[in-house]
Amino acid sequence: MLNLENKTYVIMGIANKRSIAFGVAKVLDQLGAKLVFTYRKERSRKELEKLLEQLNQPEAHLYQIDVQSDEEVINGFEQIGKDVGNIDGVYHSIAFANMEDLRGRFSETSREGFLLAQDISSYSLTIVAHEAKKLMPEGGSIVATTYLGGEFAVQNYNVMGVAKASLEANVKYLALDLGPDNIRVNAISASPIRTLSAKGVGGFNTILKEIEERAPLKRNVDQVEVGKTAAYLLSDLSSGVTGENIHVDSGFHAIK
């Protein structure tokens, strides 16, 4: 079994127990890693504190970081460095779009809504990578969560699909930029999972049913399966992998 006892990872984007990022946390925790968590609002901190009771972390390392604020990202990672020292990687699972920009016609997306989705869902990875790099002097790994809607036009995904396409390009350019620093940057394209964010996508149950019927594995995946792939990408087992987008979707991406 993979041993991550001497590794420290920052996990961003846990909203509740259904979050993909929490599935990642559970797997990394089982493998012995020290985990650091960020959250946006105070109510998220309270939820995180409850979830930590399910993990084996001896200490609660929780930091409030709103990725829309450069100052909070900069100060947050600086404080993480002071408290826990260097880190080995970051799991980024942050995305947001206004509900009306997911449910309406894509051509009616507002400028404000378009930029908001890009800012939170894509640009946040850029500034996070810049600050996390300072805590990875010997190299490390950054992994982001994406979805098939960034590669193909998916009904009702709208502005978030464009944001995910941006995120996936972001991953490639960060991989190129940070490669000389021995920092790898990859993405996991996860199958639709019943998370808080998924509630905003129209026809979500139809998508789940289609995957069960048409995907090679004839089933949907869960958060822990994404977590297992994240553990691989965050660990030295994937030392030669960067700029990659690995699909954890029962093979749905491979069929027409």
Swiss-Prot record:
Keyword tags: Fatty acid biosynthesis, Fatty acid metabolism, Lipid biosynthesis, Lipid metabolism, NAD, NADP, Oxidoreductase
Domain of life per record: Bacteria
GO BP annotations, alphabetical order: fatty acid elongation
EC annotation from Swiss-Prot or TrEMBL: 1.3.1.39
Pathway noted in the entry: Lipid metabolism; fatty acid biosynthesis
Catalytic reaction list: a 2,3-saturated acyl-[ACP] + NADP(+) = a (2E)-enoyl-[ACP] + NADPH + H(+)
Keyword field contains Oxidoreductase: yes
Pfam families cross-referenced by the UniProt entry: adh_short_C2
Gene3D superfamilies recorded: Enoyl acyl carrier protein reductase (1.10.8.400), NAD(P)-binding Rossmann-like Domain (3.40.50.720)
Mutation effect (A95V): Exhibits an 240-fold decrease in kcat/ Km for NADPH, whereas kcat/Km for DD-ACP decreases only by 18-fold
Listed NCBIfam families: PRK08594.1
Family, similarity comment: Belongs to the short-chain dehydrogenases/reductases (SDR) family. FabI subfamily.
Something else known: Follows a sequential ordered bi-bi catalytic mechanism.
The protein's assembly and partners: Homotetramer.
Annotated protein name in UniProt: Enoyl-[acyl-carrier-protein] reductase [NADPH] FabI
